[in-house]
Amino acid sequence: LVTGILLNAPARFGSKQDPLLMADAIHPNFAWEAQNSEDGPTAFISAFNMETEEGQGYYKAFVEFLAERYTREDAKYGRMCGFVISNEVNSQYVWGNAGDMPVADYTEEYTQAMRLAWICAKKHYANHRIYMSLDHFWHKVNFDPTRSNNFYAGRAVVDYALKYSLRDGNFDWNIAYHPYPEDLRNPDFYNDRAPEFTFATPKITFKNIEVLPAYLAQEKFLYHGKPRRIILSEQGFNSKGDAFSEQQGAMAYCLAYQKVKKLDTIDMMTHHAYVDNRDEFGLNLGFRHINDDDTPGEPKPIYYVIKDMDTPAEAKRIEEARAFIGPELFDALLNPEIQHGEGEANKEGDYIY
């Protein structure tokens, strides 16, 4: 089974840049001037156009085609039973651009896109799932606080999506989350400083990943009495060209995997890259190095840790990770206590738990 990510890219990811198609399919407020920006963030992907009838028509045709083709009973073309709508929409200026737009307005349109995809997909497969895509910025923080109409806190998007879905008729949207470490360059998420264990945490990374299912388990978020599902559809542990950071990444993966296994509403945990990517903003997120000819290189330590999960060798890997990270920290993060509330702010703006 495959979960697909639906993207609306004007110039990347194989776009043929058909002017007639783009005139209706690209969001009317897309920041064309930021496609190759050297001064500020780059607009890689457009939001889906929910503002015109023509835009919605192209979008529905796109989703209908994929849903019909990839949910056939004979699985002739394979199976695709879930759609992630756009990418990291709380950082919309880069990954789902609709220009300058307050979070409430952006999320209203985004919820429409999720709803249309849900309607189209459910016609062909009753168990199809639709996912909202979020990065690790959660509450009262975002990628660039000076640009509040371009970058949002993930929790605000989730809360507005609930508001609009209840207003217009509830449906079972879910969340595709990216719990990267707080600094993507450093693989040791277990040493993250920003994540806390309340609903008001600034970030949700693997360190406090338990907060996300706890937040969605609140009664107001339930759909027909059941919590919304979560997939961890993108994450990775950067290596810096040295043995120590590679070992950090391997041990981090082991702990992350143990934490996620304990969370019933998380259905999938998939890595961002199998092989290091030269164009990944300086990050090396693969399980393997990359050769000079761009073929897969030597496996990193994380490769062997992943290989040993859910095998008799897993217990030894857990022992290694516990010793490397520190038994007290490892055990505390494996069984954290979540405070179901906002936390108590102190004078520095941090939270006391």
Predicted regions and their residues:
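Helix N-terminus capping/helix-initiation residues
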Residues: 52, 101-102, 153-154, 208, ...
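Extracellular serine-dependent O-acyl
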Residues: 80-86, 225-233, 262-277
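Noncatalytic carbohydrate-binding groove/subsite architecture in carbohydrate-active enzymes
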Residues: 13, 59-62, 67, 73, ...
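Short glycine/proline- and charge-enriched loop/turn segments
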Residues: 42-43, 98-101, 191-196, 286-288
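Aromatic-rich peripheral "rim/lid" segments of glycoside hydrolase catalytic domains that contact
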Residues: 34-36, 41-43, 94, 239-353
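Short, solvent-exposed loop/helix junctions and linker helices
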Residues: 52-56, 202, 206, 296
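Substrate-binding cleft and catalytic face of glycoside hydrolase catalytic domains
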Residues: 1-144, 182-183, 276-281
